Amino acid sequence: MNIIKANVAAPDARVAITIARFNQFINDSLLDGAVDALTRIGQVKDDNITVVWVPGAYELPLATEALAKSGKYDAVVALGTVIRGGTAHFEYVAGGASNGLASVAQDSGVPVAFGVLTTESIEQAIERAGTKAGNKGAEAALTALEMINVLKAIKA
């Protein structure tokens, strides 16, 4: 039996981060966590990280697709926060972002890590952006690095 596993060290990786401006006070913490994980744990060089800001979570898939198709990046980390309100808007935005990002990864073959918080409240979002529940931006960054290495191992 062959087993493929990978670690998160990827010092030569080129990683793009797409990040939503809407709910920026939360997303800034996700970005800090992602960059810290990439550089400190993954050993990615700061010059090999590109950050692209978009208006909101719904716009993440299009920017992520452009980055994935550019051939310049080994992975893309998508960061944002969608907080449920009193209308169906949450479902449209969260579902559109989630489905769109999954499609980008499948269509491009470039790992896309999902670091979009979908929460019931601002408090839940804050907890997941570096307080009680860890930092989901950091987790997404590490997922991207691991997937870079998994795909390399599969192709080897």
From Swiss-Prot:
Residues annotated as catalytic: 89 (proton donor)
Molecular function GO labels: 6,7-dimethyl-8-ribityllumazine synthase activity
Keyword Transferase: yes
SUPFAM superfamilies, per database record: Lumazine synthase
Enzyme Commission number, as recorded: 2.5.1.78
Transmembrane segments: none
GO cellular component, one term: cytosol
Residue numbers binding (2S)-2-hydroxy-3-oxobutyl phosphate: 86-87, 128
Alphabetized InterPro entries for the sequence: LS, LS/RS, LS/RS_sf
GO biological process: riboflavin biosynthetic process
Similarity remark: Belongs to the DMRL synthase family.
Function text: Catalyzes the formation of 6,7-dimethyl-8-ribityllumazine by condensation of 5-amino-6-(D-ribitylamino)uracil with 3,4-dihydroxy-2-butanone 4-phosphate. This is the penultimate step in the biosynthesis of riboflavin.
Subunit structure: Forms an icosahedral capsid composed of 60 subunits, arranged as a dodecamer of pentamers.
NCBIfam families, per the entry: lumazine-synth, PRK00061.1-4
Protein name: 6,7-dimethyl-8-ribityllumazine synthase
Organism: Salmonella typhimurium (strain LT2 / SGSC1412 / ATCC 700720)
Gene: ribH
